[in-house]
Amino acid sequence: MTARGTRKNYQRLWRWGTMLLGMLMICSAAENLWVTVYYGVPVWKEATTTLFCASDARAYATEVHNVWATHACVPTDPNPQEVVLGNVTENFDMWKNNMVEQMQEDIISLWDQSLKPCVKLTPLCVTLDCTDVNTTSSSLRNATNTTSSSWETMEKGELKNCSFNTTTSIRDKMQEQYALFYKLDVLPIDKNDTKFRLIHCNTSTITQACPKISFEPIPMHYCTPAGFAILKCNDKKFNGTGPCTNVSTVQCTHGIKPVVSTQLLLNGSLAEEEVIIRSSNFTNNAKIIIVQLNKSVEINCTRPNNNTRNRISIGPGRAFHTTKQIIGDIRQAHCNLSRATWEKTLEQIATKLRKQFRNKTIAFDRSSGGDPEIVMHSFNCGGEFFYCNTSQLFNSTWNDTTRANSTEVTITLPCRIKQIVNMWQEVGKAMYAPPISGQIRCSSKITGLLLTRDGGKNTTNGIEIFRPAGGDMRDNWRSELYKYKVVKIEPLGVAPTKARRRVVQREKRAVGMLGAMFLGFLGAAGSTMGARSMTLTVQARQLLSGIVQQQNNLLRAIEAQQHLLQLTVWGIKQLQARVLAVERYLKDQQLLGIWGCSGKLICTTTVPWNASWSNKSLNEIWDNMTWMQWEREIDNYTHLIYTLIEESQNQQEKNEQELLELDKWAGLWSWFSITNWLWYIRIFIIIVGGLVGLRIVFAVLSIVNRVRQGYSPLSFQTRLPTQRGPDRPEGIEEEGGERDRDRSGRLVDGFLALIWDDLRSLCLFSYHRLRDLILIVARIVELLGRRGWEVLKYWWNLLQYWSQELKNSVISLLNATAIAVAEGTDRVIEIVQRAYRAFLNIPRRIRQGLERALL
């Protein structure tokens, strides 16, 4: 009965307790999320940075690129790392690639650097008296072979023998000199057949290339400084723009040969499967088309003339190198390539173009005109600049049923040689390439083409005409750099978690850790944010990978140039790369220090996560998203989150400072430190001054009050007798009355005595009041403890009651279940028994039925 009464009395309390428990469960389900900082996450963003070069060049090589690479490029990595990024899709755009612009500037700087110490040919800007060199010879082919060997005979007037006056080693004396010039290098004066001048003489400063320099390029690798990476697209059919699903990361590109050529791309990389055509816009005929072959076409070029070189003095300390004479027959330079291989290549290109341009007939034609560098295939062969006529290569029509056929096995391209070259099509810059002695032979591989498409009326006839193009060397570099892009690594990431920074403590500065290669940590880019395979420790260590090794390599390259007392463009870039790598690391460490996360890979904060930044749940974030996807999700709020973390850390440091200021009172012995004595004296003076001031104020108030009542002021220590009541008469003269028992405070004289008396009264008053307060608090605590004990006993009894009720309910439920199961079992057994008996009685029932039928 007592338990039932208790349940009846506290039924309302039970209802409120249930509601409170439900609210707690709801609140726990909607748990707050907090911003957490992660250091070492595999996240990157597109960037432009200073690239430096790596090369296998040797110091004893005299070739211009080799010398340049030896002094300014770092050695290539013997074991380059390429990390495949699984489950990563990245957008590439070869037409908006800053690496191309950098390479263009670098190659131009290379040529300028190589020509700086060379001789200027300004004294040769004089009138030249020229006559045509006789190019006929008795040793030419006979008449039966004139058709096939017509290219061997140099055209009349192609080579000219010129005389001119030049300054000798003595400035005021002139001397007549003779030299051989090619027709492309001189211009007639006033349409005169005998008076000429050097080309570009009136518009450019002509610089003679140094005699020991050749122009054969060697492979160069473009590398990024630490903190950056190069993403590489490995899709075999990648067209240069759009998403790429097979992505890897490297520190340096493959070896790229800086071959300066037009129309045909030489000694480049090949497509892996089939021919690929690339253009920024195929519908715009002004845009160039870059063709990448899947199989190279070998082209062999020759200058058969056996030239001799002559040195002509054009002033003190300056010499002009020219062709003195040609020994033997004067024959034309030429290039040979296989017709079958070339036609097969053109067929593959035409097939690709036909698919791109709606099955129209594809026609190839010669260049439409322009500078010699564009009209002809220009390139450098053994130090001489060849200009070859490619009309035989681009003179065919292709459709589904017909193709060009020819019985000739070899295609021979007639070539002209030019010594004065207008480099990079820039006004004011021209170079004179000294003649090379002896015969010249070179072999190259055609790996690509540069084409343009005609616009206008021809397209309406179902024919698309394509012509060779070139001239902009950016397209040459773009054909090799199409699959690369530079990104900067963003190792700092923020994400919501349930953890909140609880303890205010001072963080210690951590020394930076070194790793092997910083590219390794990007291998986890395709993993989810919560994947166990992604260890932040390894990734954070690898963030500095390459910095130390890279700095050492760059320093060696820079030190190699110190004896020259000058830095090439690469030396400057390497210095920039060194500074940039350190700045990137220090910037991240500075942010971690500002946020109070120095030396931590995972750092909790007190900044609550705002659902407006991202309303995804923790499971959606950590189990389904990569760090790259998450970074794109919150990219617009990253700066705001960083600001909030900084403000939170500033507030925490203020709280920490206030907390540390209380540490000096932690030890009792510090109270007696001599450094605190002046503070104690100051406090004592303030207290005494306050007491004296209060005493004076109260005294003045007392005087004012008494003056208002009509009394004159008395001494400050005079105590007036206490007024007796009406039932207490005064004493009489005969001493018959009560002895005077009026109370009065003791009288003191002097200022110090007055202060001491007031201070004693204040201390006694404080003691009594403090004692009363302690007694009151003790009484309250006693009452609360007693009441709390009673409440605990009540809850314990209530818990025991409900436990017993729950136990009884469970027992009743089990009993009811057992009874129901037992009854069900009995029913089943009874049904089975009846069925069994019915089965056994079947013969009896049959017999009884037969008996009734017979009766």
From Swiss-Prot:
Entry-listed glycosylation sites: 87, 134, 142, 145, 161, 165, 192, 202, 239, 246, 267, 281, 294, 300, 306, 336, 359, 389, 395, 399, 405, 458, 610, 615, 624, 636
Residue ranges of the region described as V2: 162-201
Region V4, annotated ranges: 388-415
Residues with site note (Cleavage): R509, A510
S-palmitoyl cysteine lipid attachment residues: C763
Spans within the Cytoplasmic topological domain: 705-855
Motif Di-leucine internalization motif per UniProt: ranges: 854-855
Stretches the record annotates as Immunosuppression: 573-591
Range of residues in the leader sequence: 1-31
Region (Fusion peptide): 510-531
Free-text description of this protein's post-translational modifications in UniProt: Highly glycosylated by host. The high number of glycan on the protein is reffered to as 'glycan shield' because it contributes to hide protein sequence from adaptive immune system.
Transmembrane segments: 684-704
CDD domains recorded: HIV-1-like_HR1-HR2
Span list, region V5: 458-469, 460-469
Gene Ontology MF annotations: structural molecule activity
Motif (YXXL motif): 711-714
Domain of life of the native organism: Viruses
Keyword set includes DNA damage: no
Any coiled-coil regions, as ranges: 632-666
GO CC annotation: host cell endosome membrane; host cell plasma membrane; membrane; viral envelope; virion membrane
Disulfide-bonded cysteines: C53-C73, C118-C210, C125-C201, C130-C162, C223-C252, C233-C244, C301-C335, C381-C442, C388-C415, C597-C603
GO biological process terms, semicolon-separated: clathrin-dependent endocytosis of virus by host cell; fusion of virus membrane with host endosome membrane; fusion of virus membrane with host plasma membrane; positive regulation of plasma membrane raft polarization; positive regulation of receptor clustering; viral protein processing; virion attachment to host cell
Comment text on domains: Some of the most genetically diverse regions of the viral genome are present in Env. They are called variable regions 1 through 5 (V1 through V5). Coreceptor usage of gp120 is determined mainly by the primary structure of the third variable region (V3) in the outer domain of gp120. The sequence of V3 determines which coreceptor, CCR5 and/or CXCR4 (corresponding to R5/macrophage, X4/T cell and R5X4/T cell and macrophage tropism), is used to trigger the fusion potential of the Env complex, and hence which cells the virus can infect. Binding to CCR5 involves a region adjacent in addition to V3. The membrane proximal external region (MPER) present in gp41 is a tryptophan-rich region recognized by the antibodies 2F5, Z13, and 4E10. MPER seems to play a role in fusion.
Miscellaneous section: Inhibitors targeting HIV-1 viral envelope proteins are used as antiretroviral drugs. Attachment of virions to the cell surface via non-specific interactions and CD4 binding can be blocked by inhibitors that include cyanovirin-N, cyclotriazadisulfonamide analogs, PRO 2000, TNX 355 and PRO 542. In addition, BMS 806 can block CD4-induced conformational changes. Env interactions with the coreceptor molecules can be targeted by CCR5 antagonists including SCH-D, maraviroc (UK 427857) and aplaviroc (GW 873140), and the CXCR4 antagonist AMD 070.
Listed name of the protein: Envelope glycoprotein gp160
Organism taxonomic ancestry: Viruses, Riboviria, Pararnavirae, Artverviricota, Revtraviricetes
